[in-house]
Amino acid sequence: DLVRSRGLGDVYKRQELDNGQIVTLTADGYEVTTFTGEPAEATPFRVEWDVTAAEKGGFNSFMEKEIHDQPAAVRDTLYGRFDEQGALTLDELRIEESLLRSVNKIIIVACGTAAYAGQVARYAIEHWCRIPTEVELAHEFRYRDPIVDKQTLVVAVSQSGETMDTLMAVRHAREQGAKVIAICNTVGSSIPREADAVLYTYAGPEIAVASTKAFISQIVAAYLLALYLAQVRGNMFADEIRGVVAELQEMPEKLQTLLDGADEIKQLGEDLAHAKSVLFLGRHVGFPVALEGALKLKEVAYLHSEGFAAGELKHGPIALVEEGQPVFVIVPSKRSRHNLHAKVVSNIQEVRARGAVTIVIAEYGDEDVVEYANHVIRIPASAGLMQPLLSTVPLQIFACAVAQARGLNVDQPRNLAKSVTVE
C-alpha cells in the first residue's frame, strides 16, 4: 500500500499493488511499474472508517474497547445484507447461483480464533443447508492431499486477510478448481483479492492482538453465507430465513445487556487470577466456544487452559480436575435437542464432585444449574445456534480481567503478532 499521511486517521484512500508491481515515491507523487519497469496501474479504493476506532475511547486497553464494540460490530456486519422482507441480498458474492446449487461439499480453512469461528459456522451450514462441511486448519489443509474439486466451496476466514497459511490454502484450493469465498475484516487485503468472492465483516479496525469483535463478526458473516446458500438452494422456507434474520438483529441489544453486567465477570477474573490452570467445557456449538475461551486465556494471561467437548470428560480430561480447579461450563438452552442440557448439567455435577470451582454460563431462568455451580454467569435466552454469539463474551471479559490482574499488557501479548504473515 502507498501511505502518505501524518497519522493513521488520515488514511482513507489506498492504492493496492498487485503481485509483481512496485511503487516509486518522488517529490511529485508516485509511479507504479512492474518489476521490469513497464508502467502499471494499482487498484484504488476508499477505506471507510472513523479515526476514533483507533483510540481506546476511555477504556484501559484496546481489548476492552473492542469487547464493548461488539454490539456495533454485529450491527455493521448485518447492515445491508437483507431486504425488508428478510431475504438475503449478498450481491457482493459475484458467484453464479447455479454454481452454488452444485456445491456438494464445503471446506472452511482458517487458523486460531478464525478456525473456531469456522467450527461454529459448520453447525449452522450443515443444519440450514444440509451440505457436508469440514473445518481445516489452513496450515494443515494442503499437506494432507484434500479431496477438492469444482463442486467444492472453500470458505477462507481471516481477520487481517494476510494470514499466510490461509492465503496458501486459498491458492491450493483454486488450483484444484474449487470456488473460494473469503470472510475478512480488512478491505483490499490479499486473501479477498485472490478469492472468487468476499464477505467483509466491517467490524472496524481491531488493534488488540487477541481477537474479540472479529470473532463474533466472522460467525455472523458465516451465518449470513449459510442462510444465503439455504435460500439459493431451497433448503429453507422464506419465513424460516426471516426468523433467523430477526434473531440476528436482536443480537446487538442482547450483547449490550451482557456488557452492562461486565463488572461481576471482571471481579471473578481478579479472584481467580492466581489459578494454575483453567478448563472449559461445552457441547455442540458450545464446544468451539470452550476452545476459544481457553485460547483467549492462553493468549493474554499466559495461563494454562484447555477446552474440551464435555462428552470427552470421562475419556481422560476428568483426570485433570482437582480441588480448587476452575472449570467453565457452557450450558445449552433447556430447549436444545437431544437432551443436551441435562447431559451438560451432569458434567457440572461430575467436576463439582471432584472439587472443581464451577463457573457456569447459562440462560436467565435456568435454575437446574444453580445447585452445582459456584458461580453462574447469566446470558439472554436465544436460539441454539445464536448462543455462541453470547456465551463467548463473558469468556473474553474474564480473560482480559485475569491478564490485567496479573499486570500484563493485554493488547500486545508476548511472542504474538496481530497478523501472521509467514508460514
Model-predicted segments: where are they?
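A SIS-like phosphosugar-recognition module
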Residues: 14-58, 62-66, 72-423
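Single conserved hydrophobic/aromatic residue that forms the stacking wall/gate
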Residues: 1-12
